[in-house]
């Protein structure tokens, strides 16, 4: 009798496991936030996408990112000319004028070597 009850329990447990199926429900959504900015008694609304939200039965994952600016950055002009900064003192002006003379003197010494 004990053996037959074990077979019946095994059959019931097997049929219960056979009807169970693993399933995962996934919901992927993008969150949009409305930002209201006010300046000088004027307000305007801007919609900003904050990221992607993935929801499963076990966990929720939030993916965020920094949005890229919509305006282009200014391009710096490339100039090949060199400028000398302004000199504010008389000693500075004398030193600025002396630099080419010293360089010329060193070049002259190099010619004799």
From Swiss-Prot:
Keywords: Cell wall, Glycoprotein, GPI-anchor, Lipoprotein, Membrane, Secreted, Signal
Annotated membrane topology: Lipid-anchor; GPI-anchor
GO biological process: amyloid fibril formation; cellular response to neutral pH; filamentous growth; filamentous growth of a population of unicellular organisms in response to neutral pH; fungal-type cell wall biogenesis; fungal-type cell wall organization
Lipid attachment residues per UniProt (GPI-anchor amidated glycine): 92
Glycosylation sites: 22, 80
Coiled coil region boundaries: none
Disruption outcome: Leads to an altered cell wall structure with a less electron dense inner layer of the cell wall, and a disorganized outer layer.
Name listed for the protein in its UniProt record: Cell wall protein PGA59
Gene that encodes it: PGA59
């Amino acid at each position: 009798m004990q053996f037959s009850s074990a077979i019946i329990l095994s059959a019931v447990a097997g049929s219960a496991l056979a009807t169970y199926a693993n399933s995962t429900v996934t919901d992927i959504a993008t969150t949009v936030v409305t930002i209201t900015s006010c300046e000088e008694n004027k307000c305007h609304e801007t919609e900003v996408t904050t990221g992607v939200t993935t929801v499963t039965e076990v966990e929720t994952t939030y993916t965020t990112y920094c949005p890229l600016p919509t305006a282009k950055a200014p391009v710096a002009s490339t100039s090949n000319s060199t400028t000398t900064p302004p000199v504010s003192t008389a000693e500075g002006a004398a030193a600025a004028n002396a630099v080419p003379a010293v360089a010329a003197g060193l070049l002259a010494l190099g010619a004799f070597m």
